[in-house]
Every structure is written in C-alpha cells, then in structure tokens.
C-alpha cells in the first residue's frame, strides 16, 4: 500500500507522534500528508493536545510588569474551589515564554499581539523601538528592523496574514498604524511583508479614531474599537462608535461594523478573541457601574452579527478593589466565566477577577507590581505549526543582485577612464545599470545599510549626475 493510500485517521495518528520540529520534513514526503499537516483544524487539534493535556485547562499569554509568560488557567477548578490557595494554584506559570539573546525586549515589553500561533512583541529601549515575532511552540523568532526610529508608544501595531486561494499558503504581514497626521485627515500606515522583508507605506483619509491601542486578530485580520471624529480630526460630543477592520489581504481598512450597544467617552470598551474564531467585546458603563460582554456569531471584514448578551454584572462591589481604566480579559464560553486582568486602585498589585454569570465572583492576587505604569495584558493562545520565514535568504539574494549591478557600474567607470578624459557617450545599457543601482542603493540605505560599503558616497552622488535618466 502506498503512503498516499493510507486512511486519514492513520495518517493523523502517525503525524501526531512526530516531534514538532520534524513535522514539516515528514509531511513533505507525501502530497496528501502535506495537505493534512497544513490543514489548520488538524494543526490546532494536534498542537492543542501537545501543550494542554489536562482537562478544562486553557492556555493564555500574559504580560505582567513588562515580562511575557505562558499561563495555564483551569476555570472549572476555580469555579468549584473556595480556598484562596487552591484558586491561586489554578492560575499557573507554564514558563517564561521565549528566551532571546537580547534581554532588553523581554524586560521592557509593552505590547503583545497574537495571531495564528505567532506573537508580536514590542519593547522600547534606550536604542529605540524593538520588534520581534515568535512562534513559542516551535521555538522560532525573527527580529524586525523598524523602517524609522522615531515610532511612538501611541502607534497601533498588529500582525496578520494575507489569504491565498490555497488556504495552506499564507503570507504573514505586520501593520504599523501611526496616530499622527500631517494634514487634516491624511494618515499613514506601514506594512511589513515577511516574505520580501520589506516595508510599504500607504496614505489614506479617515473620519474615525482608535481610542485604545490593543486590537484583536481573527482569521488573519485585525479589529479595533473606533469612534467618529470630524473632518479636522477633532473629537465630537457623543460620537457614533463601531468596529473597524484591517484586511491584510487587500491591505485596506474596511467599512464600519455595528456594535450591539452605544458607548460614551467615559465608558471602557475592550476587545478579546474567542479561540481566534469569534470576537468578544466588554463594555463597562461609567455612570451605571455595569459590565456587559457580547460575543459575535459571525464576523468578517465587511459583516458582523452578534449573539445575545453573554454576561452582565453589577460592578459596584468592585469599586474599591479594582480599576477599569486599563484592563484585558478572556472568556470561557463553556463555563460562562470571564477573567478580567488589571491592577488594584493603588497600582501596586496585579489582580485577576473571575466572574461568572451565576453571580460567582472571586478575586485573585497575582503578586506585587514592579512597574505601576505597565498594566497586565492577556490574550488566548492557540499553538500552531506556522513557520516564521527568516529574512536571510532574501537578503542574500539581494546582496548578489546588488553586487552584480555595482560591478556593471564600475566597469562603466573603467571604460570612461580609458578614453583619457575625452567625452564619452554613455550607452543605454550603462544608464539602465546606473538607474537600477540608484534605486537599489536607496532601498538598502534603510533596509540593510549597504550603500556606503558598496560605493563611496561621493561616487554615489556624482555617478548619476551625468546621466539624464531619473530614478
């Protein structure tokens, strides 16, 4: 019997016994096996088994005091226990999430973003912003060099992927959306393509703002809570609110998506994902001290529908124990439980509030906060086999092409010298070479800094002065 003729159940059993780092190599031996290993429902089931072996346990990525951890949370046990020590043991550190050679970003991480098993970590150091993408389950990381050094903390960051006709082929991308505008409603955002290791800049107009930094990734796209602003970017009284989606396939923002409620400027609205399949939104009413959580039944870049109210809680008993200005949360639909992370009113302790729709409430002290300005962040974590494409091969090919063009221009210079100073007519071919070199060196100035090493700056500037061709 040929490998391709084996039943799917047997193939799944075989692949599930293969070490994680060897799955791709094994799958490449057979087309059917490769198709199965790239099926996202199978990989989600496979990697879910490898990490979460205990029943009723869920995995989350949690950032506390600028450090990132993988946590296991047993909400079923929490709901049953009354003893504080047993409840605290139900929220366990699995491990420090990643180990990098440069500890700066681990000790100064301020933003985490999860998409399809990949994590985007962002940190600010004395040397500027640092970006790293990691698949903690495969132990793969990739540092990304920012296009500019003067990014701001208020900028929005996200990671997603471009969808192909073949669902197993995806191009991972990162979005950097700048808050500042240079002329009324004209804004700009940058997209980093993992395959080409390049940045693209886009300008657009908008009539909305994103009051909160943290978005949520679902099915490769990113969603934010947004409010309307006027034509000059100024806030208006009681503005309409809605969701806005960035589609990584079209590289455009979509239309407004309606919410099941209307919020005011003093209300708190936070987004979260449910197994990276549905969107959950939390609203805490400022004047009523009431918290509501809604969950979508369907969500796409241009369409959304909502389920009935998932949870509604009177927050008055929590006024003196918890602050809602900067919180994050995740839910368990099966247990009808929500976990809300934040700080106490003095900003000295990290707190987790476990709330059930049957009136259950329990507060867990996660320890002293060493950074009063860094609020806990949490997002559900779904391990995956997504490989992080490294930039080395792309850059190596780029160097080869660049060296070839540099050689062509130097040959042209040598030809000019042989004319003993007499005027020499530049050939069409030489002009093309110089034009290509100009463009590539300009690109490398920010990408890999090869311009100054390939051609001295004076030759770089003078070499094209005689050429009528403009880049």
Curated annotation (Swiss-Prot):
Residues 1-46 form the F-box domain. PROSITE patterns: FBOX (PS50181). It comes from the Eukaryota. InterPro entries: F-box-assoc_dom_typ1 (IPR006527), F-box-assoc_interact_dom (IPR017451), F-box-like_dom_sf (IPR036047), F-box_dom (IPR001810), SCF_F-box_component (IPR050796). GO terms for cellular component: plasmodesma. SUPFAM superfamilies: F-box domain. Pfam families: F-box, FBA_1. PANTHER family: BNACNNG10540D PROTEIN, F-BOX DOMAIN-CONTAINING PROTEIN. This is Putative F-box protein At5g36200. It comes from Arabidopsis thaliana.
């Amino acid at each position: 019997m040929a490998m391709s003729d084996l039943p799917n159940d047997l193939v799944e059993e075989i692949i599930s016994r293969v070490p994680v780092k060897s799955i791709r190599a094994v799958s490449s031996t057979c087309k059917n096996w490769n198709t199965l290993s790239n099926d996202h429902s199978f990989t989600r089931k496979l990697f879910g088994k490898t990490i979460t072996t205990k029943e009723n346990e869920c995995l989350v990525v949690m950032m506390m005091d600028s450090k990132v951890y993988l946590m296991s949370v047993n909400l079923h046990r929490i709901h049953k226990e009354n003893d504080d020590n047993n409840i605290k043991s139900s929220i366990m550190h699995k491990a420090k999430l990643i180990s990098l050679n440069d500890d700066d970003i681990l000790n100064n991480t301020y933003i985490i973003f999860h998409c399809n098993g990949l994590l985007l970590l962002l940190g600010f150091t004395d040397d500027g912003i640092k970006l790293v993408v990691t698949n903690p389950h495969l132990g793969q990381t990739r540092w990304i060099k920012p296009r500019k050094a003067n990014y701001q903390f208020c900028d929005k960051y996200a990671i997603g992927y471009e969808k192909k006709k073949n669902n197993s082929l995806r191009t991972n991308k990162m979005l950097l959306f700048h808050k500042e505008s240079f002329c009324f409603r004209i804004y700009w955002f940058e997209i980093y393509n993992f395959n080409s290791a390049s940045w693209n800049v886009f300008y657009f107009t908008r009539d909305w703002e994103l009051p909160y930094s943290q978005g949520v990734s679902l099915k490769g796209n990113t969603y934010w809570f947004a409010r309307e602003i006027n034509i000059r970017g100024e806030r208006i009284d009681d503005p309409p609110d809605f969701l806005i989606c960035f589609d990584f396939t079209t590289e455009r923002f979509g239309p407004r998506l309606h919410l099941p409620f209307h919020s005011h400027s003093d209300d708190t609205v936070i987004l979260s994902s449910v197994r990276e399949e549905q969107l959950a939104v939390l609203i805490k009413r400022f004047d009523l001290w009431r918290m509501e959580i809604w969950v979508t039944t369907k969500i796409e870049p241009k369409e959304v529908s909502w389920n009935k109210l998932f949870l509604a809680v009177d927050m008055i008993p929590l006024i003196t124990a918890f602050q809602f200005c900067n919180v994050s949360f995740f839910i368990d639909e099966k247990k009808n439980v929500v976990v809300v992370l934040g700080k106490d009113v003095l900003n000295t302790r990290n707190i987790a509030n476990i709330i059930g729709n049957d009136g259950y409430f329990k507060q867990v002290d996660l320890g002293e906060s060493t950074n009063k300005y860094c609020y806990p962040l949490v997002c559900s974590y779904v391990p995956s086999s997504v490989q992080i494409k490294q930039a080395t091969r792309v850059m190596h090919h780029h160097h080869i092409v660049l060296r070839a063009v540099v050689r062509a221009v130097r040959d042209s210079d040598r030809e000019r010298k042989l004319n003993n100073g007499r005027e020499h007519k530049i050939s069409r071919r030489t002009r093309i070479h110089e034009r290509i070199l100009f463009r590539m060196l300009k690109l490398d100035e920010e990408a890999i800094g090869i311009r100054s090493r390939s051609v001295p700056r004076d030759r770089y500037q003078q070499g094209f002065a005689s050429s009528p061709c403009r880049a």
